[in-house]
């Protein structure tokens, strides 16, 4: 089995924030594969699906971003899985909006959600880094990530999250590079790669 974790902050006030694109990706996956309604568990909300013959537990921590590791750790210990079976979907300032990269391990790049998870289960998990771009000034980062996507941005966010969902079986099979390429081509086909997103 695999644990798919989307990072974000709980509550309507944060639901459209750039920082919540991890939640948005998990919700898109749940919709695409007809997942049962999310229920409260592991200090978060969970559901289950099957992809490529693999059981997938979907988790959205409700601990707030900075304590995400508590929720992830609860699930990891309950299912007795290694950190390598965890895939975390999160916003990435260092990638252009709409760009996606998958990596295993590494640093946290200042992301407090990743920092918390690493403290609880080590850094031996895979990350789906979802680009939201950088405001250009370090002092503006907090305001930027906690700001809502604009109406213009919403077009690529919706297309991107759908593409992540459609191609999620590739992640389940460990085909990370193929997953990235499929998403790039989907964005390109939608005409979004021509808007300076990549």
UniProtKB/Swiss-Prot annotation:
It holds the Pfam family Pept_tRNA_hydro. Belongs to the PTH family. InterPro entries: Pept_tRNA_hydro, Pept_tRNA_hydro_CS, Pept_tRNA_hydro_sf. It is an enzyme of class 3 (hydrolase). It is found in: Cytoplasm. The record marks 91 as: Stabilizes the basic form of H active site to accept a proton. The active site is at 19 (proton acceptor). It catalyses: an N-acyl-L-alpha-aminoacyl-tRNA + H2O = an N-acyl-L-amino acid + a tRNA + H(+). The keyword Magnesium does not apply. Its main location: cytoplasm. Hydrolyzes ribosome-free peptidyl-tRNAs (with 1 or more amino acids incorporated), which drop off the ribosome during protein synthesis, or as a result of ribosome stalling. Transmembrane segments: none annotated. Keywords: Cytoplasm, Hydrolase, RNA-binding, tRNA-binding. GO terms for molecular function: peptidyl-tRNA hydrolase activity; tRNA binding. TRNA binds at residues 14, 64, 66, 112. Its EC number is 3.1.1.29. Monomer. GO terms for cellular component: cytoplasm. NCBIfam families: pth. The record marks 9 as: Discriminates between blocked and unblocked aminoacyl-tRNA. This is Peptidyl-tRNA hydrolase.
């Amino acid at each position: 089995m695999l644990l798919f974790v989307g990072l974000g902050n709980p509550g309507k006030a944060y639901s459209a924030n750039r920082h919540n694109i991890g939640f948005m990706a998990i919700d898109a996956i749940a919709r695409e594969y007809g997942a049962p309604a999310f229920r409260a568990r592991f200090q978060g909300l969970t559901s289950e699906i099957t992809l490529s013959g693999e059981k997938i537990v979907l988790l959205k921590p409700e601990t707030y971003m900075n304590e995400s590791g508590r929720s992830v750790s609860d699930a990891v210990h309950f299912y007795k899985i290694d950190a390598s079976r965890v895939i975390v979907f999160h916003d990435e300032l260092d990638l252009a909006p709409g760009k996606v990269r998958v990596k295993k391990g590494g640093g946290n790049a200042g992301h407090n959600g990743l920092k918390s998870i690493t403290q609880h289960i080590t850094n031996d998990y895979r990350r789906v880094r979802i680009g939201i771009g950088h405001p250009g000034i370090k002092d503006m980062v907090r305001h930027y990530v906690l700001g809502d996507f604009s109406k213009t941005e919403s077009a690529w966010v919706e297309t991107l999250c759908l593409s992540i969902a459609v191609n999620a079986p590739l992640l389940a099979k460990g085909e990370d590079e193929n997953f990235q390429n499929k998403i790039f081509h989907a964005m390109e086909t939608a005409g979004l790669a021509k808007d300076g997103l990549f």
